[in-house]
């Protein structure tokens, strides 16, 4: 039986600490603190959790963390706000360039996308 927490099926064969990181918004340290607060051993695999342990983990995540859809929408709203106020970071988001001061003369291919070839200008004859 798969354990579903906030709409995500946790992998059965992984330890609880690792399995919780499949939830958007929960990393390794958050997963450790969730399991500690819920009183679940970190090293137990998800398939060995009891229904009571799964319910406790669900309860802790629901009460203390903003995850999945809520977090995604908050991040999107933050980016939209930056673009609306027209600050530097918002402008860089809008034109699809790096935000944090990286040089774009040679690299930044991930952010800029695939190369666009520009036709060569014919050299002027002397």
From Swiss-Prot:
The record's Gene Ontology biological-process terms are: translation
| Gene Ontology MF, one | tRNA binding
**Record GO cellular component, one term:** small ribosomal subunit
Keyword hit for rRNA-binding: yes
Q: Point to the regions of Basic residues compositional bias.
A: 108-126
The domain of life is: Bacteria
* UniProtKB keywords: Ribonucleoprotein, Ribosomal protein, RNA-binding, rRNA-binding, tRNA-binding
Region: Disordered; residue ranges are 98-126
- What NCBIfam families does the record tag this protein with? uS13_bact (TIGR03631)
Function, in words = Located at the top of the head of the 30S subunit, it contacts several helices of the 16S rRNA. In the 70S ribosome it contacts the 23S rRNA (bridge B1a) and protein L5 of the 50S subunit (bridge B1b), connecting the 2 subunits; these bridges are implicated in subunit movement. Contacts the tRNAs in the A and P-sites.
* Family the UniProt entry places it in: Belongs to the universal ribosomal protein uS13 family.
- UniProt cross-references to HAMAP family, sorted A to Z: Ribosomal_uS13
Q: How does it assemble?
A: Part of the 30S ribosomal subunit. Forms a loose heterodimer with protein S19. Forms two bridges to the 50S subunit in the 70S ribosome.
Question: What's the protein called, per UniProt?
Answer: Small ribosomal subunit protein uS13
Its gene is rpsM
């Amino acid at each position: 039986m798969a354990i579903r927490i906030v709409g995500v099926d946790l992998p059965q064969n992984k330890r609880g600490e690792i399995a919780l990181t499949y939830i958007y918004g929960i990393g390794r340290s958050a997963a450790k603190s969730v399991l500690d607060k819920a009183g679940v051993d970190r090293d137990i695999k998800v398939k060995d959790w009891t229904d009571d342990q799964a319910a406790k983990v669900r309860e802790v995540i629901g009460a203390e963390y903003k995850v999945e859809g809520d977090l995604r929408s908050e991040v999107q709203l933050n980016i939209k706000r930056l673009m609306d106020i027209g600050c530097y970071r918002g402008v860089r988001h809008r034109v699809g360039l790096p935000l944090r001061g990286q040089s774009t003369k040679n690299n930044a291919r991930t952010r800029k996308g695939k190369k666009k070839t520009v036709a060569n200008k014919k050299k002027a004859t002397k």
